[in-house]
Amino acid sequence: MNPNPNPNPIRLHVISASVRPTSAARPLAHWAAAQARARFEVTPVDLAEIALPFLDEPEYASTGIYAHAHTRAWSALVDSADAFLFVLPMYNGGFTAPFKNAIDFLYREWQGKPAGLLSYSAGGSGGAPAGRMLRPVLESVGMVPTEASAAVPGITGLVTADGFRAPEGLAAELAAVLDELAALARTPVSA
């Protein structure tokens, strides 16, 4: 049951943008979803469980004509969201190929929807370069990225068998992203 008392809650999909079996995205996304539940109707989405193949649709995504059941299911899931929080690892300075592939499968479903970024890395950047690289991609499919973002440097020391241990200040960073997502999701999109 969603603890959000709002009769029309914002439907936030928290997407783990990694398919690695040992990815830190899962425990980090679980933590982020827990932080968001007070204000949003949260749906966790794990790209590894979605298991999209490399883009195999014969038509361009902008047509909305989908030949494959996996694309239609992905379309319905993305379309059901009002906003997104992408939990984004950084690999070699960029974001993951499976995540780009998942974006490329669709077009209309992303239009006008706000997107927040929670990036992470093993190093000191917290994945911020991957987030900067992702922003123009999100804008190209008509999404509205938040100005605020949250970043987690040194992720390997923060994930244990018990889950993710948030460093000091991260909850406040994420709260700023969630505040902006809520404001953007409640703002009508102009044509």
Residue ranges and their predicted role:
Residues 30, 34, 38, 104, ...:
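Short, well-ordered alpha-helices that flank and scaffold nucleotide-derived cofactor binding pockets
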Residues 43-54, 141-161:
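Mobile beta-alpha loop/short-helix "lid" or hinge segments that flank ligand
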Residues 17-20, 107, 123:
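Amphipathic alpha-helical interaction elements
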Residues 96-112:
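Rossmann-fold NAD(P) dinucleotide-binding segment
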Residues 9-13, 114, 153-162:
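A short small-residue
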Residues 1-101, 164-191:
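N-terminal beta1-alpha1-beta2 submodule of the flavodoxin-like/Rossmannoid cofactor-binding fold
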Residues 114-155, 168-172:
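Short, glycine-/small-residue-rich phosphate/pyrophosphate-handling segment
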